[in-house]
Amino acid sequence: MNFKALLIFVAIAFSSPSWAETDSLNLDASDTASQSEVPPAADQQWKSDIALIIDKAYELTGIKYKLGGSRPETGFDCSQFVKYVFEQALNLSLPPSARSLSKMGETIKFEDLQPGDLVFFNTRKSRFSHVGIYVGNNEFIHAPRTGKTIRVESLTKNYWLKRFNGATRVDPKETL
């Protein structure tokens, strides 16, 4: 593991031990960065911001789903859950629908997912009809549907894998 990868791993590992594992970081052993190279301050800041996003999302597990809900007291729908997490964790204002969220940031391939990425699904015979936050280890956290609560689920579960529509990595500069 090179120095850059070690820094990222340590920053995330000490932020939230429940989800920080090297597999979820997609660290590439072939990265040829020198031992003395330090990631730019903005990049390091975003890595620590990811921990805030994941921690805030986990704090909300168990809260009920409510269509159009946007507060912990009343419940959340999927997109309002994502919007709330990013606002509370980073003071970033995101759009209120899964479809509009899908247009933000950089498109990410399934195999390149990193914690904090938004994952999208076709759950209503419509592209980008559901959204969650990737937390690592092929898992994501989301507000599923009426009668359910915010929870962590496996992306590799057949139901979600068949409905996976894509992922994006939110650029904080886009939201200002």
Segments (PLM) and residue ranges:
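Catalytic cysteine-centered active-site loop
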Residues: P40-Q44, I63-P115
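Structural motif
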Residues: G116-L118, N138
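N-terminal targeting signals for Sec/Tat export/insertion, comprising classic cleavable signal peptides
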Residues: A29-E59, I63-K66
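N-terminal signal peptide c-region/cleavage motif recognized by signal peptidases
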Residues: S15-P17
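Aromatic- and glycine-rich peptidoglycan recognition patches
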Residues: N2-F3, W19-D31, E37-Q45, I108, ...
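Sec-dependent N-terminal signal peptides
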Residues: L6-A13
